[in-house]
Amino acid sequence: MVAGRKAFALQAGDALSPDKPAEAQPAQVKTDLAANRQDAVFRYAQNGVQVTKTITLHPRNFKVDVRTEVRNGPAQVNMLFPGLGKADNPRVQAVPVGGQPASVQGSGTLSVQNIQYAALQENPSQIAHALIVRPQQGTKVDVQLTGGPQGLVTATLPATSSLEVYGGKNELIHLYQSGYTELPGLFQPNFFGQISLLIVKLMEALYKVIGNWGLVIMALTILLRLVMWPLMQAQGRTTARMQLVQPLQKEIQEKYKGKTDPESQRAMQMEMAQLMRDYQVNPAGCFSTLLPFPVLIALWATIRNFEFDSGFLWLPDLATPDPFYILAVIYLFVNLGQLYVSTRKTPEMFRQQAMIYLVFLYFALTFPSGVTLYIILSTIIGIVQQIIINKQVEHETASLGQTVQKVAPGTRPASKTTVTKTIDAPKK
């Protein structure tokens, strides 16, 4: 937990010292599959003092329970929690019961009585770590916080004590799964962190019903797409109408081909603008394509840090990339299918953009498999939505005689300023 450090070392004057020899017994390890826990019992004697430490490991998080019993020794002992391995100048903090956080970073010492918790923390990031100590079962703990390059928490405990110790990432999802996000002053999530918390709570609620993390991600994907369905309509309708007007835009460009004088260029721009108005193409509708990205970023941060207790199908861990690259292949074909649906009337655009998805294939190879699963299913739902919208838009224009196929070659719905009007554009 703390590489190269004597964590959980006891100290009490000459009676107990981590630097003096002790008579130690072989550790006893007991696994309780029903309770999903593992206990390791360590016993040793030093200067006539007998010490028993029981350390309980819990799956899916980075915390252990440390129960200590000291016999024939002093009424109080010190337990040392020295630094965070190679971390430099961590923040050393403690919060007394009913009080406010007190911290030291850099030089200096600080004493805090009757703590709710004490912590050594690096600045939050994906590679930052934290060590958090919480008294359990009514144990009263006083601490001395020592700042400096490594930092030190010295906890004063009764001879019989119980602590919960977290040693892992100083990151929101890990802390949440270990039950520490509610501790005052420990961690303040940002905007994406708040979204991540909502996602992980929804995932846990779905898991209680479904009981499979892969199916939970799929159900979450469907729910999110249903919520975003109305918002994605504007983008879908813009895409469908753009497919209808692109051939007409090319006709206008051909009409003014080779004409570089300002008047011709201005006339071409006016015809282009009128064409967009006639077919009710709203470029602002494309902004809705940005809506899924905050959710995707938050979901990516959630899944890659989430501790899953089981895999899904051939995937051993939904928080890691697919080791067999099957999802990456599916991802590529699904995205090409989405591109085809969006550019089916302009094959040259499909060919131009198809190569871009080979670049995106890299992300499918490196993303957590749970995130790739979300993207694949979300894209499939998006394809279905776009097909429905395409049919709706074609039906709307066809009912008014406005499909591109019904526009004679070399003609288009004329603008309101054109003297000879061919076919009115659809009006709503």
Swiss-Prot record:
Annotated Pfam families: 60KD_IMP
Annotated transmembrane regions: 209-229, 283-303, 323-343, 356-376
A GO cellular-component term linked to this record: plasma membrane
Cell membrane in keyword set: yes
GO terms of molecular function: membrane insertase activity
Topology in membrane: Multi-pass membrane protein
InterPro entries named among the record's database cross-references: YidC/ALB3/OXA1/COX18, YidC/Oxa/ALB_C, YidC_ALB_C, YidC_periplasmic_sf
Superkingdom, natural source: Bacteria
Main location: membrane
Gene Ontology terms: biological process: protein insertion into membrane; protein transport
Coiled-coil residues: none
Subcellular compartments: Cell membrane
Keywords recorded for this protein, A-Z: Cell membrane, Chaperone, Membrane, Protein transport, Transmembrane, Transmembrane helix, Transport
NCBIfam families in the record: yidC_oxa1_cterm (TIGR03592)
Complex and partners: Interacts with the Sec translocase complex via SecD. Specifically interacts with transmembrane segments of nascent integral membrane proteins during membrane integration.
Family membership: Belongs to the OXA1/ALB3/YidC family. Type 1 subfamily.
Matches recorded under PANTHER family: CYTOCHROME C OXIDASE ASSEMBLY PROTEIN COX18, MITOCHONDRIAL, OXA1
Protein name stated in the entry: Membrane protein insertase YidC
Lineage of the organism: Bacteria, Thermotogati, Deinococcota, Deinococci, Deinococcales
Gene: yidC
